[in-house]
Amino acid sequence: SIYANHPRLTAKQWKNLQSYVRNGGGFVPVHCASWCFSNIPEFDQLVGGRFKSHQGADFTARVVKKEHPALSGVKEFKAWDETYFHHRHNEKGRTVLMVRDAMPGDPHTKPEPWTWVRTEGKGRVFYTASGHDQRVWNHTDFHQLMKSGILWAVGDKAKARYEKFLASRVPLKYEKRDNVPNYERRPEPLPYQLPLSPEESMKYTQAPVGFRLELFASEPEIINPIYFQWDERGRLWVVESVDYPNELKPGRKGNDRIKICEDTNGDGKADKFTVFADGFNIPTSMVFARGGVILAHAPEFLFLKDTDGDDKADQREVLFTGFGVGDTHAGPSNLRYGFDNWIYGTVGYSPFNGEVNGEKHNFGSGTFRFRPDGSDMEFLHQFNNNTWGIGFNEAGDVFGSTANNNPSFFGGIPNTVFGSQRRMSAKMIASSPKFHPIPPNIRQVDAFNAYTAGCGHAFATSSGFPKSWRDRRAFVCG
């Protein structure tokens, strides 16, 4: 699909697109796509016409081929849109489905072709001129037009596989509950979605093309995982927190624990579960170091170690203390073992205020590092709000994310370099803080339609990723 204003296309790109469609691919150019790629005249012929001019008005595009499968379930709808006028029409293999009746200012008095389909070799093309802005895109009848058009364009076999897949999923069930927040001030709060089994939930998860999901461990063996790490033996260590975020207990004795999940028979699923340590209250991260585990357990950082080989921690010591617990949503997190043998982490607006090896530190909303034995600490990069993500590229540069409106920042020069000079804050590098989830029923609290729960910043550096991904893409949870 294309929905964009791009003036040029390379010859190689055009050859690939043309070949894709002629060999059976589906192509869905929408609205301004009919203006694109003026340097390739053949592109207009593939689309079926080219945008020439427009005004703007409230109008209803009229259906003229109601029986066509690309209009299955589609109703006419009225909305403000740009009143496209096309030229360079290619009527070969084209069927016009909807038209816009002539209106004042049009260069002609005939109905203007508005939505059409055409065939190109073995492939199919669906085009609609609708879609200038949210006045159209927010319309449920436009959603149906796009859905029906896409399902026609992909072809009958792909559509049949899609419908078979939908039929295999357990239907989602909802119920109204009084305690569901309505921060967005919708006319009605979103209903509560009843839970699915992990297996059924995976069917509702969309993975990138070429990727697949595999279930390694799930409830009831692990509960409320808040962080995990893989060890050198391929075992998954999971930090479980049933107390997070509201059950902050006096003395910090709680119900949370670290659990080792192991696949003992090589079938790709965990079948052995061992509690390494328990009795914690809202731990938020862990990292392997010094033959054991360092656990973020505000206000303290703990070192845990198994000394007798039974996979249970029998040594527990406090490395340092000082992290705030005023808001459990804003404490330390995302511990990572750095290339320089320091431990890196993030903290939000529940800041660190304490001493490490006799030196006073006071910082918040940024990244820090410390030595694995707790003998030294440094605050590295200041950012502007609740910091919950850190990651390294292959060169060891530090990147991160914040909960609100800043899904990706570059650490740059650390504060330790500046000494007494004015320091430079980390800089946002994301092109936009906007958040585009696949499902529509997303509850947000602060930055509506943008990142309001951003966390993590893991670069795709493994050789298991496509070459085009490596060191060029990062995963940030929303």
Q: Model-predicted segments: where are they?
A:
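Beta-propeller domains with acidic blade repeats across secreted/periplasmic ectodomains
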Residues: 11, 168-478
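Short alpha-beta junction capping motif
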Residues: 1-37, 122
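Structural recognition of the beta-strand scaffold that forms the well-ordered cores
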Residues: 1-3, 26-31, 95-98, 125-129, ...
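Catalytic beta-strand/loop cores that center a nucleophilic Ser/Cys/Thr
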Residues: 49-129
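Extracellular ligand-binding/catalytic regions of CAZymes and related secreted enzymes
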Residues: 105-111, 119-187
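Glycine-rich, charge-decorated loop segments at or immediately adjacent to ligand/cofactor-binding or catalytic sites
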Residues: 35-46
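Short, solvent-exposed loop/turn segments at secondary-structure junctions
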Residues: 7, 34-36, 101-104, 121-122, ...
